Amino acid sequence: MEHNQEHAGHEYFSQLYGATSAEGEPQQTIFDKWRDKMLVNAFRKYSDHNLATSDVLDVGCGYGWLLDAFEGAKSLCGVDIAHHAVEVAANRKPNRFFKQGDLHDPSPFAQKFDLILAINIIEHLSNPVAGIESIKNAAKPGAIVLVHMPTISNWLTKWEYSKLYDSDPTHIYRPSGKTVRKLFEANGFETLRDSYLPHFPAFLTKIWPIHPAYLAVFKRGN
């Protein structure tokens, strides 16, 4: 991957998360916490499995905060290309499983998962097809994959993207939400739901997207 993300450190993640504690440490924003709750609700709505019996993988896990929202799952695993992020996540939650890895490559975990979280990660891939194939290979038949990322669908979202996301040089893949959906469907996934911020009602947000943030719920075929 470009921009030496493997060696991204404290400064990069401080900018990435957009909020810091009183001690100057990166932390989640209120919006991120709201989004995480929405992701949990999406899993409960669309999955055939209970959270307590589900194996969960977060690709591009960063410091592992998203997995906090899925506490109570059978297993919680995270993978990130940045050694720093994996170290912080493992120290923060030693009862979980974190490994360093690149989404362009096969999953470093031998097991398969009932839920895979790909939150703000696809836009960092120089080869998104390889990333989606890696996700598919890590997913059990019938698994749910939740995808969230910035996209460009029209002149308005292109302008918003330039104001909200251009500052991150690691955003190298800038598709429309429709393109992302087609890539997943071409790799054997069924689209159960997709929308743009504010995400409700979903069908209205797709008629004319007013924000780059795209959320999709995919299901791996059997």
Please provide the spans of the model-predicted regions.
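Conserved N-terminal segment of class I S-adenosyl-L-methionine
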Residues: M1-Q111, I119, I132, Y173, ...
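Short N-terminal helix/helix-N-cap motif within the alpha/beta-hydrolase-1
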Residues: D68, S126-A130, T157
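A structural helix-start
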Residues: H83, L125-S126, M149, S153
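A short SAM/SAH-binding and catalytic strip from SAM-dependent methyltransferases
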Residues: L115-S126
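A short glycine-rich, Lys/Arg-flanked "PGG" loop and its adjoining helix->strand segment in the class I
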Residues: V129-I144
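Short, glycine-/aromatic-enriched active-site segment of Class I SAM-dependent methyltransferases
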Residues: P150-H171
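Short alpha-helix
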Residues: I172-G188
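Short proline/glycine-enriched turn/loop segments at secondary-structure junctions
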Residues: L183, A202-W208
